[in-house]
């Protein structure tokens, strides 16, 4: 504590009184004296001191040094408690000036800005009256023009429907059915209606009318599940091929006569063939011909195989 107390008081003590004493007696000598003293004291900033002196007269530099001394005093107060004791001991007038800015730093910066604000307000004050003057003018315009306020009301109201055109009267020779409620624009172009009653239009139409009203036939619905019986084999009677057509009965006598005449020669030929070849021959004949002549040939073959005893 003892080491901190003597070190801070020595630099700040000369700086605040010198800054305040130089501008107060002679405002003109302030620019020369402050730069020399701040150079000796590195703590306070040298550039801010000449700016307030040049910007304003003797009245303005008084608050800025107090403002700049107040941050230094506030920094000293934050660093150590004994820093606050040297300023009052050095000069009594500086203590009251330093204490209020330290307590309320916000109002002091507004003091130099107050003339600027006042100057800004002064031009604004003449500009403020014109809006009131314009307001009465707008109100007078609104009061003088009531029709625009009432004009939008009819826009929102439903418009009346357009008048309907007069119905066209058909020519004297045209008969219009009474069921037609709307006017016919082409009534003059229509030919005279001479239709008979509905039941006597046409006999075909009368017959087809009930057929059209009948419901469609019931189609067989597909099976929901597969049948329990096994699938039909290709040899089943349902899928068997149709047999070849039988010979015409008129040709049967001629066929029998031809076979009887050719029987001896056929029997001789069949006797020369072996049994396997005969079986093959009968099979081919049964495929391409009806079974009746094959039965005859087979009977003849049996007669040849078993001759008379």
From Swiss-Prot:
Keywords: Host membrane, Membrane, Transmembrane, Transmembrane helix
Biased composition annotated in UniProt, kind: Pro residues: 1-17, 24-51, 84-112, 160-174
Keyword Protein biosynthesis attributed: no
Classification lineage: Viruses, Riboviria, Orthornavirae, Kitrinoviricota, Alsuviricetes
Record organism: Grapevine fleck virus (isolate Italy/MT48) (GFkV)
Transmembrane segments: 278-298
Location in the cell: Host membrane
Membrane-topology annotation of the record: Single-pass membrane protein
Ranges annotated as biased composition (Low complexity): 67-83, 113-125, 135-144
Protein known as: Uncharacterized protein ORF3
Signal peptide: none
Region listing for Disordered, in residue ranges: 1-174, 216-240
Statement: the UniProt record of this protein carries the keyword Membrane: yes
One of the record's GO cellular component terms: host cell membrane
